[in-house]
Every structure is written in C-alpha cells, then in structure tokens.
Amino acid sequence: HAFVCGVPGAGKTNTMLHICYSLWKNCNVPFLVLEPAKKEYRALSQTDIDDLIIFSPSSGSRFPMAINPFEFAMGLSLSEHIQNLMNVFEGAFPLTPPLPALLDRAIEGVYNDHGWDADDINEGNKEYPTISELYDRLEFELKNTDYDGEVRGNMKSALEMRIGGLLRRDLGNVFDVKISSLKPEELIQHPIIIEMESMGTGPSNF
C-alpha cells in the first residue's frame, strides 16, 4: 500500500499516472482507478496503453458503464455474495434496523425467483436478478411485515431514497441492467479507469 500526499501542484497526479503506466507497460500488472472527481487520469489514453478501458457513467457519455450488482464471480457461493452485497449496501447508505434484515431477505428472495439457492456456487448457468426486481421484492416484503402504518411508511420512504435512487435517470442506466459491461473477474484483468464525478456520493460509494 502507498499513501500519496502533497500540497496542490506538488505532482501527486503525475506521480500516480507514472505509477499506473509503469505497472501495466513494464510489469503487465493491471490497475483499476476509481476517480471521484475530475477526469485527469484520461491522460493515460494519450500514451501507448492501447488496451486502456475508460468508463464515465453520465448522460450522453461516450464511455457508458453498466454494473449489475447481482452478477458475481464464477466459483463464488451465492451466500458469500449476498453477504458482500449487504456490506456494500450498508457501507453506501445509512440503513437502520430493521431495514438490513428486510433487505437481506429481499436479496435472497430475488435470487430464489431465478432458481438460485443460498449454497449454490456460481457456474455461469443461471440468470441474475436486477435492482428493479429487488425494489419490487422489497415492496412485497414490506407489505407483509407486522409493523404499524407509520413505521412501515418510514421504512418505505427510506427504501425509496436508497434503492429507488439507483433506478432513476443516469443511475438506472448504470445499475438497473441484466448484464455488466465487464464480468466481475475482468475488472482486475485490464487497465481500467472509472470516472464517478457525476454519480453522487451514495451511488459512488455503492
């Protein structure tokens, strides 16, 4: 690990550009740049890294990106991926009890709808759910809880803000898809830049 710091203009970005370039061209080590602001790492496209992949999810982008969070690596168990998904959701959005339990149940439910069992190992022969299916499943699970009207209404509002936000406009084009632009394992096999400036804090964390 390395921590690169310095005052503005000290050369932090140029240092990182040099490191990324050298890793791929000299050592054949792929890199994944998550750029939360600006588009400075596009400078690498002006070098001789011919296989550089750039994603810039935004309206009218020339470099669109699609990520289905329910698609996971071959050889991984569904149970393990559901736990990873829960960690991602809880890290990206504030979820107070009982929302995590409801979300966990809904995630497993949408996989069940596509023929998955929790102990299944991904062999690439089953379809993955989508975010819109999760949203519909959450509404179903919420209607079947024993919470009173006010609590249920608060939970519905929270889910609308968190999960519903991933369905609207540009974010829907990124996350509410059946197939990702790259398979999960491919994200660590190529030199890749993902520009996240237009996505907002919560979705970027997600």
Task: Identify the meaning behind each predicted range.
Residues H18-F206:
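P-loop NTPase motor domains
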Residues V7-P8:
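The conserved Walker
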Residues V4:
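Hydrophobic anchor at the beta1->P-loop junction of P-loop NTPases
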Residues T15:
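Hydrophobic positions on the alpha1 helix immediately C-terminal to the Walker A/P-loop
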Residues H1:
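Walker A (P-loop) ATP-phosphate-binding motif of ABC ATPase nucleotide-binding domains
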Residues K12:
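Conserved lysine of the Walker
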